[in-house]
Amino acid sequence: MSNQTASIISKSTCKKKTYNILTFDTHERYQTQLAKTGHNFYAFRSDGCKEWNQDYGKQPENYYTLPKNSIYHGLDFDFILSQSKFGQIQASHQINQVLKLPIVSLEHTLPIPSWPDEQFSQLRQMTGDINVFISKYSVGRWGFTGESHEVVHHSVDTSLFKPIEVDKMKAPEGTCVTLNDHVLSVVNDFKSRDYCCNYSGWERITKDLNTKLVGSCSEGLSKPAHSIEQLVTDYNYASVFLNTSTFSPIPTSLLEAMSCGCAVVSTATCMIPEIIEDGVNGYISNDEAVLKSQIQNLLKNPGLAKELGENARQTILEKFNEDSFVNNWNNIFNKAYGLKK
C-alpha cells in the first residue's frame, strides 16, 4: 500500500472529539438540538441576515456568534454547515473560496410548486459535499432520490416538552394561559405565510370555536410565548392542537404538541401522514369539515383526547428521540471531517 493510499484511508476513518463548525442562524429549536452533538458552532452573520431570536430558544453555550462579516481566520474550522438554499449555500461557497472546507448542506424547506423549471433547476444544483434532508418526502421533492444524500428526522427534547400536571380551572402564577376548553395553534407570521401555513383555512375550521394562537406576528394577531416553559404550559392546557400547514415538511410545533401529550388534529400534507395514524395518535384530513368535526369530537370526549395524546407522545419517543438525532448527525459530521483536505 502506497503512503498516499494509506493517508487517504487514514483520513477517511479519523474523527475529532470536538469539531469547529461554521454555520448560520436558522431555526433556534432545531439548532438547540444540534448543539447537543457537543461540537462548537460558530454563526456567520452579514447585513440583513437572520439572527438568533431568544424568544424561540436560549442560545446554547457551545453556539457562538461571530462579528458581522468575519470568519476569524485564527479559528480552525473543520467544515461548513449550510441550512438553506436561499442565501446560506451561496454564502458558504463564497466563504469557501478562502477556507476551502467541506460543505454540509441541510435543507429544511420544500421547492415551491409555482416555480418555473429553470428556477427549480438552479436551486436544485446548489448543493454541498454532503446533502441532508429532514424527511424522505423532502428528498423526493428536491429530486435527490437517485443521488447520494442523508435523511435526519427532527428530534424533540422530551424531557422538556412533556405532559405536566395542570389545573385547568386555575392559571399558574405569572402566566397568561387560556383556561376554558380551547384549540391551540403555534405559528409565526401566520397571516403573511398563508401560502404554506394556511391561515385562511384555520379561520374557517375554527369558526365558533374557542382558540388560542401563539407565535410572533407583525399583524398583531398573536404573541410568542415569553419562555419555552410557558410554551410547554400552553401545550398542556390546550384541549386540542390544530395544525393547518399545507406546505411544510413537518412543523416543529406539531411534534412538540405531540411530545406534550396533546391530542392533535392536522392536515394530511407532506410528511405528516408518515407520523400521524388517523384515529390512533391523532386525526388527519385535508377536508376542512372533517377536521372541524374531529376537533369537536375531541372537545366532547376528553378521555379520547387523552388516549390519542398518550399515543402521540409515544410516537415522538420512538421516532423523534434525541439519541437517534445526535448519533445521525455525528455520523454525518465524522464523514464531513473525513473530506477535509
Regions found by a protein language model. Name each.
Residues 3-13, 322-341:
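C-terminal alpha-helical cap of glycosyltransferases
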Residues 127-167, 180-188:
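Donor nucleotide-sugar binding/catalytic pocket of nucleotide-sugar-dependent glycosyltransferases
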Residues 158-222:
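Conserved catalytic-core segment of nucleotide-activated headgroup transferases in glycan assembly
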Residues 232, 251-259, 273-274, 280:
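Short alpha-helical segment that forms part of, or immediately flanks, the ligand-binding pocket
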Residues 246:
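Aromatic "clamp/platform" in nucleotide-sugar-dependent glycosyltransferases that forms part
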Residues 278-289, 297-303:
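Conserved acidic donor-binding segment of nucleotide-sugar-dependent glycosyltransferases
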Residues 297, 304-319, 325-331:
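A short, well-ordered alpha-helix in the C-terminal region of glycosyltransferases
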